[in-house]
Amino acid sequence: MKVVQRPLRSGFALLALVATIACGNGDSPSSPSPAPAGPAPPAAGANVFYTAIGASDANGVGGSVVCIPFAPCDTGTGYVPVLARSLRTGREVTVRNLGIPGAFLSPAAEQISREQGHSTTGNFVDREMPFVPGETTLVTVFGGGNDVNAITEAAERGAGGSDTKGYLDAQIRAFGTDYARLITGVRGRAANAFIIVVNVPNMAALPYARGYSEPRRRIMQHLSVGFAREANRQAAPGIVVLDLMCDGQAYDASRFSSDGFHPNDAGYSHLADRLRAIVNGASSSASGSCSQMTVVAAL
């Protein structure tokens, strides 16, 4: 039988047909598709493969039980083993601690440190991110303190010439670029991982810096606040920020070791508690401003 296709009687009929098809496909321009959801925290009772990216803090330097880099360390008192132990109730937790003492988050900051005559141990982008296992379901990233110290030293030695603030702002932008590279690389290696980014506190407010000159602390503060904001920009589906910058308890001198730079057991326990809350479903976001951002005068 020959099928005869009859022409539509009017343009109105054609428009009605197009509208019907569009609505049937859910393509109405007034109803945009929801943004894709990223990986969620590991479900309660589900096994966890936890990978930590960090510097000496990841190894628990300053605590009573310091972990040897890359070695199993179930009894450590740093935030990585403390968090892992707290998550093990009723499930298996596998830990890959990639923390390297002295490491920089940013390759650019590491290069600046070398230019100041220091030997370095690496950076997160080149020495840690490439080793994130594909089966990882939870990642924490905490770094930036070493970057602040190195760039502060360079600025004090005249790296910025007559435009110190311009120099610092350029380093903040470079840090942000490297942070984005890091997170993109982690996501590329572990597509199903829930990522917690811990922003840097105001290093000028930590005990080790309280005896420094006002100009030095102003540089440290400018970098710290800038670095924290770059970390905050990494928030995305499946990536949340733990706001250490605006956490008043994080600056309590009783939570630091004798060097005033590394946390002690109490400081690491506080960080692990905050991380555990996020893993267990607590919401977390960074503040746009807080008193901890202005402990000294701005540049």
What are these regions (language model features)?
Residues 24-27:
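Bacterial signal peptide processing site
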Residues 37-49, 82, 115-137, 181-192:
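Short amphipathic alpha-helices and their capping/turn segments at secondary-structure boundaries
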Residues 61-63, 107-173:
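Oxyanion-hole/transition-state-stabilizing segment in secreted/luminal serine hydrolases
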Residues 19-22:
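C-terminal motif of bacterial Sec signal peptides marking the signal peptidase cleavage site
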Residues 56-60, 100-106, 144-150, 201-206, ...:
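Solvent-exposed loop/turn segments at secondary-structure junctions
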Residues 31-101, 139:
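Serine-esterase "nucleophile elbow" of acetyl-processing enzymes
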Residues 2-12:
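Bacterial N-terminal signal peptides that target proteins for export
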Residues 200-299:
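Catalytic His-Asp segment of secreted/periplasmic serine-dependent ester chemistry enzymes
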